[in-house]
Swiss-Prot record:
One GO molecular-function entry: urease activity
UniProt binding sites for substrate: 223
Top-level enzyme category: hydrolase
Chief localisation class: cytoplasm
Modification after translation (UniProt): Carboxylation allows a single lysine to coordinate two nickel ions.
A Gene Ontology BP annotation from the UniProt entry: urea catabolic process
Record key words, sorted: Cytoplasm, Hydrolase, Metal-binding, Nickel
Cross-referenced Pfam families: Amidohydro_1, Urease_alpha
Record-annotated active site: 324 (proton donor)
Species this protein is from: Anaeromyxobacter sp. (strain K)
Protein name, as recorded: Urease subunit alpha
Entry similarity comment: Belongs to the metallo-dependent hydrolases superfamily. Urease alpha subunit family.
Cellular compartments annotated: Cytoplasm
EC number, as in UniProt: 3.5.1.5
C-alpha cells in the first residue's frame, strides 16, 4: 500500500528533501536542497513504532566491517561541495559514507558499507543541518578556556601559538622554541579539540626555525612585533619549503623595514597565509589588502572587523592598545594604533569576502578577536552582503546556495587546505575525521545542537541533569562524554610537522592524541581556495584609503543591526 505525502508532511517526518527551501537562523540567507541521497519510502527513522528495529531497518548477521558505529539519519549537509540530504555513516571515528543507510535485506538502495546493525548508535538528523567542524587558524593560546568557547560554537580545530597570558602571546600567535612547543603540546593534550602549534618564524637564519618544527610545531608565524623584515620573511619561507609547512604572516604596520611591495617581493612567489588581510589587526598601512590579488597568497580575515558595523571603528582602538602593549598616553603609540583603523578598507573587506577574494575566516582569540564567534561572524558577513548586494551573479534559482557554500568554505575546507590538514578535517566526505556539527535551522550559526569529535558527542545543548528528561531549562551548551577521560585523546588529533615524527622527540611527550603530520602546504595558491579563488587587480589610494578591485570602488555601508546577535544570547 502506498501513500502520498505533501511536502510539509514529508519534511515534518523525514526532514526537507530536494527542492525544499529553508532560512538560516534570522539571516536573509535561504538555502535549497539540491539533491536527496536517501530512498523515498525506505527512509531510516528511529523511535517507537518506527523503522530502525531488528529485522526492519536494522540488519542482523551483517559483516562487522560493513556495520556503522553511528548513523546520523536524514541530515541536511551544508558543505562547500554542495547542499544535500543524506544519512551520514560513521565508523571508527571517521566518516564511512554518505548516502542511504539501513538494512539491505529489506530496503532499497542501501549504500555499500552503510548497514545499520546491533552495534549502531543513531542520531536523528531529521530537520537538522550538518556541517563540518570549524577550523580556526588564528589562535592566541592565551587561556585554555578558549577551547570550551570554540567547541561550543562549532569549531573543532585550533591552530595558533602562545604559552598562556605572556606578553608575547597576548600580541603574537607564536609558541617560541622547542621547550615551549613541547610543553604546549602536553598542555593542549587535555583540550577536546584538534590542535596545531605555530612556532616563531622571525629569524634571519634557519637553525632556530627548523628546531621548532622538529619539536612538534605544525607551521611558523611571522609577526611584526618580533620584526617581520624581508630577510626574516625569506628565511622563514626557505625553512617552510624544506619542511612542507605553512607560514602565516602579520606584516609591518609601520613600514619600517619595507612597504607592501617589499614584503610581496620577499614572498618571491612562495605560498604564504596572510592573517587579518585588511590590516586593522596589523599589516602594512594602508595597503596590505593589496595581497588579495597575489596568486601565491592565501588571505584570511580575523573576526573583529567582521562584518563592518557602526561600532567597528570605535572598539578597535582599546583592543589594539591592550593587545600590542601600547601606552595611549604616548603620541607615537597612539599614532601606531590609529594607523590601522580605516573604515574604507574594512568596508572593502566585506565586499572582497563576497567576491571570494578573501578566502578564510579566523578569530585572533583574546588578541582582538573572539574565539567563540568565528562561525557567527562569518554568517553575519554573508547576511550583510546578501542584504546590501543582492544575490550573487552565479546563483541559479530562488536561493543563496552559492553564497552559503562560499562562506562555509571560509572556516572549514579552505583553512584545512592552507595548513595541510585536509586529509583529516575540513569537509563532510568519506575518510575524514567525523568532526561534525548539527544545527537546528533557527539557531544556525549561533548555537549548535550537537558537536561530534571523532564520531563521539563532545558538546551539546543539554538541560538540567537532575530532570527526568534531557530538555528542561536551563538548556546550555555543556561538555559531553567525548570531551572526557581517555575518549578525548582517542577522538582528537595533534597536528605536527613531518620533521617532528621523523625526529622522534614528539613521540616521547606522552600525548594521548594521535599525532598527524601536516602535508601539502607548499605550492598552494589562491586557485586552491574552494569557491574563494578570485584574483582581482587591487589598488589602494594612500591618501583616501579607497580600495578598488579591477577598477571598481569597493564600498558598503556599516550595518546598524545584525542577525544571530542579542536575541540568541539572552541566556
Amino acid at each position: 500500500m502506498s501513500r502520498t505525502l505533501d511536502r510539509r508532511q514529508y519534511a515534518q517526518i523525514y526532514g526537507p528533501t530536494t527542492g525544499d527551501r529553508l532560512r538560516l537562523g534570522d539571516t536573509a540567507l535561504v538555502l535549497e536542497v539540491e539533491r536527496d541521497l536517501t530512498t523515498y519510502g525506505d527512509e531510516c527513522v528511529f523511535g517507537g513504532g518506527k523503522v530502525l528495529r531488528d529485522g526492519m531497518g536494522q540488519a542482523a548477521g551483517a559483516p562487522p566491517a560493513q556495520v556503522l558505529d553511528l548513523v546520523i539519519t536524514n541530515a541536511l549537509v551544508v558543505d562547500h561541495a554542495g547542499i544535500f540530504k543524506a544519512d551520514v555513516g560513521v565508523r571508527a571515528g571517521r566518516i564511512a559514507a554518505l548516502g542511504k543507510a539501513g538494512n539491505p535485506g529489506v530496503m532499497a538502495g542501501v549504500t555499500p558499507g552503510m548497514i545499520v546493525g546491533p552495534g549502531t548508535e543513531v542520531i536523528a538528523g531529521e530537520g537538522l543541518i550538518l556541517t563540518a567542524g570549524g577550523i580556526d587558524t588564528h589562535i592566541h593560546f592565551v587561556s585554555p578556556q578558549q577551547a570550551a568557547e570554540a567547541i561550543a560554537s562549532g569549531v573543532t580545530t585550533l591552530l595558533g601559538g602562545g604559552t598562556g597570558p605572556a606578553t608575547g602571546t597576548n600580541a603574537t600567535t607564536c609558541t617560541p622554541g622547542a621547550w615551549n612547543v613541547a610543553r604546549m603540546l602536553q598542555a593542549t593534550d587535555a583540550l577536546p579539540v584538534n590542535v596545531g602549534l605555530l612556532g616563531k618564524g622571525n629569524a634571519s637564519s634557519p637553525e632556530g626555525l627548523a628546531e621548532q618544527l622538529r619539536a612538534g610545531a605544525a607551521g611558523l608565524k611571522l609577526h611584526e612585533d618580533w620584526g617581520t623584515t624581508p630577510a626574516a620573511i625569506d628565511a622563514c619561507l626557505r625553512v617552510a619549503e624544506a619542511h612542507d609547512v605553512q607560514v602565516a604572516i602579520h606584516t609591518d604596520t609601520l613600514n619600517e623595514s619595507g612597504c607592501a611591495e617589499d614584503s610581496i617581493a620577499a614572498f618571491a612567489g612562495r605560498t604564504i597565509h596572510t592573517f587579518h588581510t585588511e590590516g586593522a589587526g596589523g599589516g602594512h598601512a594602508p595597503d596590505i589588502i593589496r595581497v588579495c590579488g597575489e596568486p601565491n597568497v592565501l588571505p584570511s580575515s580575523t573576526n573583529p572587523t567582521r562584518p563592518f558595523t557602526v561600532n567597528t571603528l570605535d572598539e578597535h582602538l582599546d583592543m589594539l592598545v591592550v593587545c600590542h602593549h601600547l601606552d595611549p598616553s604616548l603620541p607615537e603609540d597612539l599614532a601606531f594604533a590609529e594607523s590601522r583603523i580605516r573604515g574604507e578598507t574594512i568596508a572593502a573587506e566585506d565586499v572582497l569576502h563576497d567576491l571570494g577574494a578573501i578566502s578564510m575566516m579566523s578569530s585572533d582569540s583574546q588578541a582582538m578577536g573572539r574565539v567563540g564567534e568565528v562561525v557567527t561572524r562569518t554568517w553575519q558577513t554573508a547576511d550583510k552582503m546578501r542584504r546590501q548586494r543582492g544575490r550573487l551573479p552565479g546563483e541559479r534559482g530562488d536561493h543563496d546556495n552559492l553564497r552559503i557554500r562560499r562562506y562555509v568554505a571560509k572556516y572549514t575546507v579552505n583553512p584545512a587546505v592552507a595548513h595541510g590538514l585536509a586529509d583529516e578535517v575540513g569537509s563532510v566526505e568519506p575518510g575524514k575525521l567525523a568532526d561534525l556539527v548539527l544545527w537546528r535551522p533557527a539557531f544556525f550559526g549561533a548555537k549548535p545542537e550537537l558537536v561530534l569529535k571523532g564520531g563521539l558527542i563532545a558538546w551539546a545543548q543539554m538541560g538540567d541533569a537532575n530532570a527526568s528528561i534531557p530538555t528542561p531549562q536551563p538548556v546550555l551548551a555543556r561538555p559531553m562524554f567525548g570531551a572526557l577521560g581517555r575518549a578525548l585523546g582517542a577522538t582528537c588529533v595533534a597536528f605536527v610537522a613531518g620533521a617532528a615524527l621523523e625526529d622522534g622527540a614528539v613521540q616521547g611527550y606522552g600525548l594521548s592524541k594521535r599525532l598527524v603530520a601536516v602535508r601539502g602546504c607548499r605550492g598552494l595558491g589562491k586557485r586552491d581556495m574552494r569557491l574563494n579563488d578570485a584574483l582581482p587587480r587591487m589598488e589602494v589610494d594612500p591618501e583616501t584609503y579607497e580600495v578598488r578591485a579591477d577598477g571598481e570602488l569597493l564600498r558598503c555601508e556599516p550595518a546598524a543591526r545584525l542577525p544571530l546577535a542579542q536575541r540568541y544570547f539572552l541566556f
